[in-house]
Amino acid sequence: MKKIIPTNLFKLISILFILTPFFAWSAPQETLIDRVVAVVNDNIILKSELDAEVNLAKQDLQARNIPVTNPEELASKVLDKIILERLQLQRINQLGIKIADDELFSQIQEIAKQNNLTVIELRDRLNMSQKNGFESFRERIRQQMLFQKLREVEVLSKTQVTEDEVSNFIQRQALVQSDVEYHLGHIMVSLPESATPDQRDASKQKAQEILQKIRTGGDFSQMAVRYSEGSKALQGGDLGWLGIDQIPTFFNDALNQLEIGETSDVIRSPVGFHIIQLQGKRNKNSQIVKQYHLYRFILLSEDAQNKQQPSPTLVKLAESLNSLESFKQLNEKYSDIPASVNANGNLGWQTAKEMSPEYYQAIEALQPGHAAKPFATEKGWVILFLDGIRDQDLSLKDKRKQAMQTLRMKKANESYEIWLRRLKDEALIDIRLEDPEIMKKQPSHEEANAN
């Protein structure tokens, strides 16, 4: 599964607030009556939920040094984001999509690794930031993984790529700077699925007006927050660093004409009109990678993380494992452990970047044919066996496989916005953001504290 989670630790901590009550301060119970701001099919969205999401969006924009110039527009944009999330969750329930615990744990390991932390360190930091912070974080990550699976089922699985397209893609990649990454800003003005000529003209005119504001000194990020209907609008339109194979094909011609800091003309696509800004350009480090073939065995223990070191008996056991055959015999030695725990013990070939920090630390100085010193995880004690080390480059077969995956993802990205729009168009949505009927006025912090 493609990684979907932001790796900045501030974001990891700040998203916890989405899962906690907005009114955390003490106030008389009768003043805390909530109200409905939207109904999505048979699901309601409360004002407290919207307020929590708006606060999170403000924190993220503040971290990017993007001022909030229009709070009402921000709230409306955030509400639209929540509505899309609810629609996707409803579809997930209809399809019976689930996330297994081991999938979730692997994703959290990846997040910890990208923040140069172990899972234990990540857990401790989140719990220090908020009570039960790690558990709330786990559920948020589970939800984002569900969204990713839904996207794979509804969009990616239906995206077809021909062998000719793969061959042409590989040939084109040989002609372009495939080792270059681009940092892009993006603004989108969307079109209805069956847009009339008048609607197309109105959307194009709006995009032209936004572009004019940017070219006369308007800040691109602020324009994105205010006007963009793209998925990254609340991040100032920041698409991050992308390889040429990750950029929508309809951006290519415009991108080739841009210098750093320049903004494109309005670009037409099937989903609307776009403006991109080239905010950076850099070379990727291309090199032969070292891969490690690992096997893993987990000894279940509820208190492993509370102990500083494994027992001498356990260390001696690991030191005695000097062949893959002896390592595999652990399944017989510990037959009381459920088979499912170690069913996926062959981890295959992995690079250092693909491993969690604790895994690489355990095998970094290890010679092939030996087991690493046991270390503690959430599930218990882990013993890794290093079966081999190799230097690996992509073969032509691997390149075709990678090209196929890249093209499918590229096509899926181009059709994702259409699918989301259709999902929204088919739903019954009642927005009550401007409804003045609030049963009791929310007190200010000062009023609440005075009570």
UniProtKB/Swiss-Prot annotation:
TM stretches of this protein: none
GO biological process: Gram-negative-bacterium-type cell outer membrane assembly; protein folding; protein stabilization
Residue pairs linked by disulfide bridges in the UniProt entry: none
Recorded catalytic activity of this chain's protein: [protein]-peptidylproline (omega=180) = [protein]-peptidylproline (omega=0)
Main subcellular location of this protein, as a coarse class: periplasm
PROSITE patterns cross-referenced by the UniProt entry: PPIC_PPIASE_2
Comment text on domains: The PPIase activity resides only in the second parvulin domain. The N-terminal region and the C-terminal tail are necessary and sufficient for the chaperone activity of SurA. The PPIase activity is dispensable for SurA to function as a chaperone. The N-terminal region and the C-terminal tail are also required for porin recognition.
Protein name: Chaperone SurA
Organism expressing this protein natively: Hydrogenovibrio crunogenus (strain DSM 25203 / XCL-2) (Thiomicrospira crunogena)
Gene, per the UniProt record: surA
